[in-house]
């Protein structure tokens, strides 16, 4: 899997770039790196693609006599490979983490005939092991109250000792009314969750929103981390909002206060959202009247955590809501969902539930989706499914729960497939027996939430939280399961 790392150029850097190079004669002074992978404290695995933004790199590698270097704390020096001439420009360099760089904090710098850039800390991380075919679920700390339609996000917050935290935001209780509650729990060394703690409540009740966390490792925020709650449903019947809330996080994980940032172009609930290279991407969902939409947008995260303007991207092939959404490498994926008009709390399987998987690649040089747009994969989900979740890592995806033909017996509660380097997917298989949440007392569920996270040892875990009960739709689950 190739993961691209992009350094984003500020307006000040762009102005500095004007006249910062003498063209074919090479740089007039030392290069300057502004950001890597859109992040303040970037990280990546061996072989990960590194995209460096800044200025005065020289118009080409040969003209600049340039190199990108990883330097280790032990004094080692590893020079990266620039695959093509187009990967080195005066403002941006694309390369990969070289084989042999040790795991841990290293420094990255650019050297040219004009000098050497100030080193940037770049942490090499081990590739996570994620094999959904061998999943075995374990119950961990349950929610204080049963919920469905809640948003879940996880992040490792920086500090002397980094803290991994899981957030549960909003959602609907047994009355189906949205809630304003915000809960968080820290992750133990073994991957279990600690007690759920209450945090500052949302400015207004919300359900069926999307949530993501910006940290210095995935965005250009300086020092602090931020929790975003995007869109959502403000009533039990599905009235979407365009509001984007932003919560400032303490080092221990608590939300210390809420504000708002740039609203979505249109109200939507049950959408998908991810952060990649300092940018938030959102897709699909349900708009006015609960009709599914196909829109896709992106907004760049600023150093103070605020979002820039939302920019339209190539739309999904057709409208889609209540779907699985995520990113693997540089590809966005949308799996299953419903293309019709469905209320959030409807427990029946719609005739417009879908089984297809679509994907689109992000151009790391611009942050936009490539001109190709979305491609429908040849491999489909085992069944049409909606109101499910999808968690992706290390070239695999795990699809959990939802409404599908056979959901009352948990026939295909868990399914998994491979995500290939070119974006395509391999065929999906089902996990049964001891590999299901129902087998450990979790019941059959939909309108739940799921996320992936790392424990302190670097092990990757998948978490499934709450949800509606398929067999008794008025029942909300408190159960939380991980593996």
Question: Where in this protein do the model-derived segments appear?
Answer:
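Ser/Thr- and Asn-enriched, surface-exposed coil loops between beta-strands
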Residues: 46, 86-94
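Bacterial N-terminal signal peptides that target proteins for export
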Residues: 1-10
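Kelch-like beta-propeller repeat domains
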Residues: 125-483
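Surface-exposed, short loops/turns at beta-strand junctions within beta-sandwich domains
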Residues: 99-104
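C-terminal motif of bacterial Sec signal peptides marking the signal peptidase cleavage site
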Residues: 15-17
């Amino acid at each position: 899997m190739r993961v691209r790392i992009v350094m984003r150029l500020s307006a000040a850097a762009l102005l500095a770039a004007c006249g910062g190079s003498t063209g074919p004669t090479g740089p007039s002074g030392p290069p300057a790196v502004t950001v890597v992978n859109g992040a303040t404290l970037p990280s990546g695995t061996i072989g990960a693609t590194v995209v460096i933004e800044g200025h005065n790199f020289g118009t080409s590698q040969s003209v600049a006599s340039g190199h990108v270097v990883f330097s280790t704390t032990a004094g080692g020096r590893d020079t990266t490979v620039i695959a093509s001439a187009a990967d080195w420009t005066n403002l941006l360099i694309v390369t990969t983490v070289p084989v042999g760089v040790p795991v841990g904090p290293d420094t990255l710098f650019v050297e040219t005939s004009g000098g050497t850039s100030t080193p940037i800390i770049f942490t090499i991380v081990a590739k996570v092991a994620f094999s959904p075919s061998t999943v075995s679920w374990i119950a961990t700390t349950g929610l204080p109250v049963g919920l469905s339609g809640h948003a879940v996000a996880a992040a490792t917050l920086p500090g002397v000792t980094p803290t991994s935290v899981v957030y549960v935001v909003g959602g609907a209780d047994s009355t189906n009314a949205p809630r304003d509650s915000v809960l968080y729990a820290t992750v133990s060394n073994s991957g279990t969750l600690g007690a759920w703690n209450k945090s500052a409540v949302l400015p207004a009740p919300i359900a069926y929103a999307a949530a993501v966390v910006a940290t210095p490792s995935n965005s250009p925020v300086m020092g602090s981390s931020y929790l975003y709650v995007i869109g959502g449903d403000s009533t039990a019947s599905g009235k979407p909002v365009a509001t984007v809330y932003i919560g400032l996080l303490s080092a221990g994980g608590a939300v210390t206060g809420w504000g708002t940032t740039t609203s979505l172009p249109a109200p939507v609930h049950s959408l998908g959202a991810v952060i990649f290279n300092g940018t938030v991407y959102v897709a699909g969902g349900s708009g006015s009247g609960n009709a599914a939409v196909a829109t896709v947008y992106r907004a760049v995260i600023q150093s103070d955590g605020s979002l820039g303007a939302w920019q339209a991207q190539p739309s999904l092939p057709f409208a889609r809501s209540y779907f699985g959404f995520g990113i693997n490498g540089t590809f966005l994926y949308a799996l299953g969902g419903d293309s019709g008009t469905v209320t959030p709390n409807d427990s029946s399987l719609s005739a417009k539930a879908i089984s297809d998987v679509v994907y689109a690649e992000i151009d790391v040089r611009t942050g936009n989706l490539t001109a190709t747009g979305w491609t429908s994969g040849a491999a489909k989900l085992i069944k049409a499914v909606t109101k499910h979740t999808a968690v992706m890592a290390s070239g695999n995806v795990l699809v959990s729960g939802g409404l599908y033909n056979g959901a009352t017996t948990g026939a295909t509660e868990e399914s998994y497939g491979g995500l290939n380097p070119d974006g395509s997917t391999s065929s999906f298989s089902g996990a049964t027996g001891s590999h299901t949440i129902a087998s450990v007392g979790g019941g059959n569920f939909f309108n739940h939430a799921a996320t992936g996270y790392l424990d302190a040892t670097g092990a990757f875990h998948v978490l499934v939280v709450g949800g509606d009960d398929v067999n008794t739709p008025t029942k909300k689950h408190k159960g939380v399961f991980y593996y």
